[in-house]
């Protein structure tokens, strides 16, 4: 249990460090950013497919955005402030394809984060995932763009 807390603390620290300054892409103002780290190799997880869905009024998931992580393990530009309205969103990270490309047979098909966004006004969300073949941890950093 203590090791899980330490792992989450380290992951949160990595997210805060990455938020401290702009990334190489200069897109630090995007309302939704995903960062994926490889816990086995101790490096950013590159070319990981990420799919974002928005929950519809009939409780189905509608595709919202998608992309792949960069050399820094980050994915920016998924949406704009105008499109990223209040609602329930699901971020799905394709862990299976990532590990298979490295010759590893993983347990999970994907890592999934479901969250309510912008219910307290516009916010910026960084969803971070720390991956290993048989587990994953996620955390989020939510900031007010006006602060």
Swiss-Prot record:
Effect of residue 56 to P: In AMYLD1; amyloid polyneuropathy
Effect listed in the UniProt record for changing residue 93 to V: In AMYLD1; amyloid polyneuropathy
Any one GO biological process: negative regulation of glomerular filtration
Protein name: Transthyretin
Modified residues (Phosphoserine): 72
CDD domains given in the database record: TLP_Transthyretin
Phenotype for residue 53 to C: In a patient with amyloidosis
Substitution effect: residue 70 to I: In AMYLD1; amyloid cardiomyopathy
Result of altering residue 65 to D: In AMYLD1; amyloid cardiomyopathy
Native source organism of the sequence: Homo sapiens
Listed result of changing residue 89 to H: In AMYLD1; leptomeningeal amyloidosis; vitreous amyloid in some patients
Effect of residue 67 to R: In AMYLD1; amyloid polyneuropathy
Organs and tissues of expression: Detected in serum and cerebrospinal fluid (at protein level). Highly expressed in choroid plexus epithelial cells. Detected in retina pigment epithelium and liver.
């Amino acid at each position: 249990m203590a090791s899980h807390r330490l792992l989450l603390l380290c992951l949160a620290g990595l997210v805060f460090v990455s938020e401290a300054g702009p990334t190489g892409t200069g897109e630090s103002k995007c309302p939704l950013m995903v960062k994926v780290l490889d816990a086995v190799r101790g490096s950013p997880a590159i070319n990981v497919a990420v799919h974002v869905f928005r929950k519809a009024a009939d409780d189905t998931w509608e595709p919202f955005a998608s992309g792949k992580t960069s050399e820094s393990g980050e994915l920016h530009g998924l949406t704009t402030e105008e499109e990223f309205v209040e609602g329930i969103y699901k971020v799905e990270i394709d862990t299976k394809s990532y590990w298979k490309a490295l010759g590893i047979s993983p347990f999970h098909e994907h890592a999934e984060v479901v969250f309510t966004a912008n219910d307290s006004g516009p916010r910026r969300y960084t969803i971070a995932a720390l991956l290993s073949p048989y587990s994953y941890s996620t955390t989020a950093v939510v900031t007010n763009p006006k602060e």
